[in-house]
Amino acid sequence: MTGIYNVGSLNIDHVYGVDHIVRPGETVAGNGYGMFAGGKGGNQSAALARAGAAVSHVGCIGADGLWLREGLEQLGVDVSHITVDPETATGHAVIQVESDSGENAIFLYPGGNHRISPESMRAVFSQMPTGSIVLLQNEINATSDVIVQAANEGYPVYLNPAPFHSQVLDWP
């Protein structure tokens, strides 16, 4: 499928409403909880599909994240490049949101998002039609490698450098 190949994170977001962000050594009770599909990559694929774009998501989840893949598929995302690794958990985030201010604090466990290998990306690139583009963000382990591989294959790369870290400045 010619279109957007989004190489990105898939997370299970655990969102807690709190009166204030927990401080070191403190235990507080939450005032709300929800579990949602998340990850910057997954959110981008969902938004692109809702906007009518042809999008393939490339990523890795554990068996606990099958519902994330199913949700993207229901939106029309090609999920054939989402690997299920039974030896890891799906990435997840614990998100505290202050009820009054909306300020948040996030703890992220990368899980399968850090299991994207150069070999798996070579397999994806070997199947990508001419004219496709690569979309990336910064919650996976292989961002700089994917940039180099995509450039070598002649695919344009669009990078959302979030969450930002200084290594981004050294990437091609």
Language-model regions: role of each:
Residues 3-4, 24-92:
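Substrate-binding N-lobe of the ribokinase-like
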Residues 1-10, 70-84, 96-172:
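Ribokinase/PfkB-type carbohydrate-kinase core domain
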Residues 20-22:
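N-terminal glycine-/charge-rich "phosphate-binding" loop or analogous flexible N-terminal tail
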Residues 13-17:
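Short N-terminal binding/cap micro-motifs at the start of the first secondary-structure element
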